Regions:
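Conserved, mostly hydrophobic/aromatic
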Residues: 3, 14, 66, 80, ...
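C-terminal active-site rim and adjoining tail of enzyme catalytic domains
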Residues: 54-60, 120-213
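Anionic group-transfer/hydrolysis microenvironments
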Residues: 16, 29, 83, 199, ...
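Short, well-ordered coil/turn segments that N-cap beta-strands
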Residues: 7-9, 72-78, 95-99, 115-117, ...
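GT-A fold catalytic core of metal-dependent nucleotide-sugar glycosyltransferases
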Residues: 3-30
Length: 213
């Protein structure tokens, strides 16, 4: 809610499964346990997950809560991370027109393409493609890729090819290196990329940044 009020309209959620197979928003179970002071068996059940609060204050989100939030905010788009099953998640999400799934294998990207799901190809499978990368993306109607900002300098040719093909590059690893914060990326790297995974809003940025929830 706070990031929405600041102006963010694209929100990233890490999606993982509870022990009883329910999709929930959490980065990983060890980190979640630290943030919630949970001391039970990992992964927890869905019921155990929903009982916990992050830092004792913030509620946890399952698919019901995620769908309720996006129903309440019809101009918001969800970008998923971690989950690599486009069919299962898209069937669970409220509005596939407002869903972009970062996917981590060629097979998952092709499956998403076959079912009309908006895919964002992750860096590792993209860089592993030996043939024409932009052609693969075009053939599979992939309009987004997620890359580390750390490879921009060494992959300028690829960045330009993606830009020329109309493929939007979102970068992560913002705030990982000294001085390389949102403003640095916005001021110095937006010529080669389209958006970034951001922790904070910059007043003169346009709406091309995904807030990390």
């Amino acid at each position: 809610d706070e990031n929405y009020k600041k102006g963010f309209r694209i929100f990233e959620l890490d999606i993982i499964e509870t022990s009883d197979g329910k999709l929930v928003a959490a980065h990983d179970w060890n980190m979640w346990a630290r943030f919630t002071d949970y001391t039970g068996t990992l992964p927890p059940t869905h019921a155990q997950f929903m009982k916990q609060k992050i830092y004792g204050d913030y509620i946890t989100m399952d698919m019901e809560a995620i769908n309720a939030w996006f129903k309440k905010h019809p101009d918001a788009t969800l970008v998923t991370d971690k989950v690599n099953d486009p069919i299962a998640f898209s069937e669970a999400f409220i509005d596939n027109d407002r869903l972009i799934m970062e996917l981590f294998s060629v097979m998952a990207v092709e499956k998403a393409s076959e079912h009309g799901i908006h895919a964002m190809m992750s860096q590792e499978p993209l860089m592993a493609i030996k043939d024409d990368k932009t052609n693969f993306l075009k053939v599979n109607n992939v309009k987004y890729v997620a890359l580390s900002r750390r490879i921009i300098a060494s992959q300028k040719k690829l960045m330009l090819q993606l830009k020329e093909a109309g493929i939007k590059v979102y970068v992560y690893n913002v705030n990982f290196d000294p001085g390389k914060d949102e403003k640095y990326v916005h001021d110095n790297e937006f010529g080669l990329i389209y958006g970034m995974y951001a922790d904070k809003w910059i007043s003169d940025m346009n709406f091309t940044s995904a807030s990390k929830l």
